[in-house]
């Protein structure tokens, strides 16, 4: 049983995040346990990098096929956007009734500061080689062609996400719901009706139901860096005071 908590992508040395490079070894170890009938993965992520999400999703599926092990995924507080994409690596997905599931979409957001810098008397000077190098510069006026280019990229990424969900969930999806791929998110209870998950329950409960009360659950955790260990030790000490 391994856990994938946090934002997907590089978030810094002190903040916990989910990255392919830092999770690869732990995922390999989980699948290398010969006696294990299945690998359980708990996800608690609102999403993040689409690239890292796809890399982790594909690696889990590859390891599952290579080692002939079933993958059972459990959504904790949230498995949304890239978090749900990773969850689709599971042969089965479970969640709490109050978990947040879905958000099958792509988002880009920024600010425009052109009027602000003019108001405070700041001149913006940009020198580029390549006419599109300053695309979506927040200190310049938006260009319709730049917006359209961004939207086209978003549509491609969105379709890739949809393909993963449709391949993973196959006939389980309630495709009559027009909101399914709109970027909307739902509770675990509603997600079950939509076919985004297979059932309601937590990891230990479901694993006992499937493999018996005496099931042995081996836990895998990513090793912490020395600074994170130091801070964690300090927090534990403070809790005991």
Where are these regions (language model features)?
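N-terminal organellar transit peptides
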Residues: 1-96, 107-241
């Amino acid at each position: 049983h391994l856990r994938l908590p946090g934002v997907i992508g590089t978030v810094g040395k002190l903040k916990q995040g989910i990255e392919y490079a830092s999770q690869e070894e732990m995922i390999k170890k989980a699948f290398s346990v010969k006696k294990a009938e299945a690998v359980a993965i708990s996800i608690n992520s609102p999403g993040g990098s689409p690239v890292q999400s796809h890399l982790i999703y594909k690696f889990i599926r590859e390891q599952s096929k290579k080692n002939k092990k079933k993958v059972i995924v459990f959504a904790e507080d949230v498995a949304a956007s890239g978090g749900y994409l990773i969850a689709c690596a599971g042969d089965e997905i479970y969640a709490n009734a109050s978990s947040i599931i879905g958000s099958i979409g792509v988002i880009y957001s920024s600010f425009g500061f052109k009027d602000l810098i003019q108001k405070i008397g700041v001149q913006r000077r940009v020198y580029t080689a390549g006419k599109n190098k300053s695309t979506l510069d927040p200190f310049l006026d938006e260009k319709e062609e730049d917006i359209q280019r961004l939207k086209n990229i978003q549509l491609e990424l969105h379709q890739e996400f949809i393909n993963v969900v449709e391949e993973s969930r196959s006939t389980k999806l309630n495709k009559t719901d027009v909101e399914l791929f709109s970027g909307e998110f739902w509770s675990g209870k509603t997600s079950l009706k939509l076919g985004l998950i297979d059932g309601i329950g937590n990891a230990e409960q479901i694993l006992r139901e499937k493999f018996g009360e005496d099931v042995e659950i081996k836990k895998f955790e990513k090793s912490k860096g020395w600074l994170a260990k130091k801070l964690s030790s300090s927090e534990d000490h403070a809790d005991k005071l």
